[in-house]
């Protein structure tokens, strides 16, 4: 007498293994290309902030809500001129956090900022990503200009600035491990 449950289980196990192996192979070949495209987007945004040829740029991997941290030093020196943070915070979308690049000069002035990734609601949250939030000094968000009607997205962007503001003094004072 044949055990149909056992046969069905083995068939499902085999299908699962084949699918897992196929997914691993696809990921192996596509992961470098995906990273290359993501890096190209980030470096294009960095080029909007600074003339990259004028600086020695190093990268540090962040933890938690911080992604890559870009350290800009004047060519041939050890003096940090600016730090650009990749930082994330939860907006309206449950699936993806709002990700920003925030460029801060050594005097704590905000050079610029850009939302590089988001999946906020079209017509609402997604429309404010190019908004001027009136942040000129990273440790003073009193003038932060949120947008009415998109509170969660505005709060996510403010959280990104807050996270950078809490961290920047330590990083400029030697807290980064390059």
Task: Describe the residue ranges of each PLM region.
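Flexible, solvent-exposed loop/hinge segments and secondary-structure transition points
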Residues: 2-178
């Amino acid at each position: 007498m044949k055990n149909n449950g056992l046969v069905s289980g083995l068939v499902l196990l085999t299908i699962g293994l084949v699918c897992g192996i196929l997914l691993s192979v696809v990921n192996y070949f596509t992961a470098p290309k995906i990273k290359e495209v993501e890096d190209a987007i980030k470096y294009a945004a960095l080029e909007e902030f600074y003339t990259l040829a004028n600086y020695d740029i190093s990268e540090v991997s962040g933890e938690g809500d911080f992604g890559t941290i870009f350290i800009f030093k004047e060519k041939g020196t050890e003096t940090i001129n600016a730090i650009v943070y990749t930082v994330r915070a939860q907006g309206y979308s449950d699936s993806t956090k709002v990700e920003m690049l925030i460029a801060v000069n050594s005097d704590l002035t905000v050079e610029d900022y850009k939302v590089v990734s988001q999946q906020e609601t079209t017509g609402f949250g997604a429309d404010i990503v190019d908004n001027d939030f009136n942040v000129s000094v990273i440790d003073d968000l009193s003038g932060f200009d949120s947008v009415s009607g998109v509170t969660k997205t505005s709060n996510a962007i403010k959280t990104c600035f807050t996270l950078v503001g809490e961290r920047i003094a330590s990083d400029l004072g030697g807290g980064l491990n390059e």
